[in-house]
Amino acid sequence: MSLTIEKSFITYEWASKLTQAAIDHATTLGLSICVAVVDSVGNLIAFARMDDCCLIGIGTAQGKAYTAARSGLNTREFLIYLKENEVSLTSLQDEKLMLIAGGLPILYQEKLIGGIGIGGGTGKQDEECAQIALQSLVLFDQ
């Protein structure tokens, strides 16, 4: 039996690349967003707020990234899971959870290494920006 466990975390270098990829995509959509990238336990690694992004986007981006990292699920899917299983948000006892679309877990070699959250657009737009950013990881890794 092992006395310790090993965890993997996304690096700042990759977190900043994800942040920029999300911003680049938001720009093509004509959006101003906030982007947060957290490690696998929900601690902030990188954050950016585009000019003219609404202030509420700051908290929602961070909350979505945190939720995706802590649950290991897309935040939209996590909400569906909770509803289908009749789990109340208060029973989770975590006030940082943000159960709206726009947060995705970051996986590397099938391990959860972090979460990305976008705030400032609609849930669908935020999720799209996060998804495009994650797809860019493959491009950066070549």
Regions found by a protein language model. Give the residues of each.
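Flexible, solvent-exposed loop/hinge segments and secondary-structure transition points
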Residues: 1-142
